[in-house]
A protein has these predicted regions:
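Positively charged n-region of N-terminal signal peptides that target proteins for export
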Residues: 1-4, 18-19
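C-terminal motif of bacterial Sec signal peptides marking the signal peptidase cleavage site
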Residues: 13-16
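Conserved functional acidic sites
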Residues: 21-217
Length: 217
């Protein structure tokens, strides 16, 4: 049970780091690029500083290079925390944003759709299974083109997502909702704030991650 909860917690927060994946899974590579008018700049040496109430500070840097994984172009990022520096991958195609990486405790590769630049009310669900136990991550576009203030700074052109988290009932027979939260992304910036909470079989956790500083090159 503790492993399942740790798995869930680790993939809950977008800002969490992901271990570098064997790039033989994909092919190619090249210089990064992409307009900053979307929700994830990828230009080389762009930087973001975050603070998580659970995990402490983190520093993310866009490497400005990419690789092809599962036929999709993924941009490379390094994130440094007190535990060290790890590699993450982000894909953005036609307004659909994905993240990809290894989850160490079970050695499983995970690919998540974490954002869609779609109409209000659009929703989608990522299903992730480990050893026959599945959890479900539902995102809904709640608001678009709003202002949102984080650590005293007001961001424009923000999209707000609501998040619902459900798991297979380990006692069998149903899926139960155990938590949820919200995510905020600003155009030309990226993730600016995320928070969540969950409670499952007597174990609960909350986290808020906020953007402190950023530089887009």
């Amino acid at each position: 049970m503790k492993l399942i909860l740790f798995f869930v917690f680790a993939i809950f927060v977008f800002a969490a780091c992901q271990k570098e994946v064997d790039e033989s899974l994909g092919s190619g590579g090249g210089s990064g690029g992409g307009a900053t008018s979307d929700y994830q700049p990828v230009t080389a040496n762009s930087e973001w500083d975050y603070l998580s109430t659970n995990n402490g500070p983190s520093h993310m840097v866009a490497l400005g290079t990419d690789t092809t994984i599962n036929g999709l172009r993924y941009y490379k990022f390094n994130t440094t925390t007190t535990a060290g520096t790890e590699r993450g991958y982000i894909c953005k195609v036609n307004g659909v944003y994905r993240t990809y990486g290894n989850f160490d405790p079970v050695g499983q590769v995970i690919e998540l759709i974490y954002l869609k630049d779609s109409a209000i009310g659009t929703n989608w669900t990522n299903k992730i299974s480990v050893s026959g136990f599945s959890n479900y991550h539902k995102y809904t576009v709640a608001k678009k083109d709003i202002q949102h203030t984080v650590v005293g700074k007001t961001y424009n052109s923000v999209i707000e997502l609501t998040y619902d988290f459900s798991v297979d009932d380990p006692l069998g027979g149903s899926v139960i909702n155990v938590g949820g939260g919200k995510y905020y992304y600003a155009k030309g910036v990226g993730l600016i704030e995320a928070y969540f909470g969950f409670s499952f079989f007597g174990v609960s956790a909350t986290d808020t991650t906020r953007l402190l500083n950023y530089t887009i090159r």
